[in-house]
């Protein structure tokens, strides 16, 4: 019974002091090839707690056709930290880890820095840049990327004290 109550309280706290978001993020890498070869696209769904967020990202490492076996689709977990905020602008840091399905270099790690603009409480735009690192059994590689994203938050979240008291 104690375990059940602990888990219930954990989930209640998780839901009470956070907000859900969805983000779409096109980007370009510095790889050789056509514009489609260099283009990436990802969709992220996650939760934000004050300055920390955790998202699950599904995407494509290239928008070019890859042949009979798709080796460009990936799934990634992306923790994000809002480092500094001034007005509607925020400096962000993201470190992610994921898996590229069917690829020889299937381990994906990511380091990203961004500048986010809060257009409204629910709609944010981000310009980001960083590196993707790919690793496999016999080889590894990395690419630099530059991208933009738009995030929609499903509710506004105000950080502050759990208990508030009105003064007269």
Name each model-derived stretch:
Residues 40-42, 72-76, 143-147:
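Short hydrophobic/aromatic beta-strand or adjacent loop that forms the aromatic wall/cage
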Residues 46-125, 152:
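Gram-negative (and chloroplast) outer-membrane scaffold detector with strong preference
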Residues 1-4, 19:
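Positively charged n-region of N-terminal signal peptides that target proteins for export
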Residues 36, 60-62, 66-67, 111-168:
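Predominantly the C-terminal beta-signal and adjacent terminal strand-loop region
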Residues 16-62, 147-158, 168:
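Short glycine/proline- and aromatic-enriched beta-strand/turn motifs that initiate or cap beta-hairpins
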């Amino acid at each position: 019974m104690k375990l059940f109550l602990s888990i219930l309280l954990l989930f209640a706290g998780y839901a009470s002091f956070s907000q859900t978001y969805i983000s779409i993020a096109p980007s370009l890498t510095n790889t050789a090839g056509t514009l489609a070869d260099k283009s990436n696209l990802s969709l992220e769904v996650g939760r934000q707690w004050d300055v920390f967020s955790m998202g699950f990202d599904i995407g494509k490492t290239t928008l070019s056709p890859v042949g009979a076996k798709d080796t460009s689709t990936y799934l990634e977990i992306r923790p994000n930290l809002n480092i500094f905020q001034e007005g509607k602008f925020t400096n962000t840091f993201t470190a992610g880890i994921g898996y590229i399905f069917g690829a020889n270099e299937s381990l994906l790690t990511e380091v990203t820095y961004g500048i986010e603009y809060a257009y409204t409480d629910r709609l944010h735009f981000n310009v980001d840049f960083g590196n993707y690192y790919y690793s496999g059994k016999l080889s590894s590689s990395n690419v630099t990327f530059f991208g933009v994203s738009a995030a929609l938050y499903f509710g506004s979240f105000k950080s502050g004290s759990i208990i508030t008291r009105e003064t007269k």
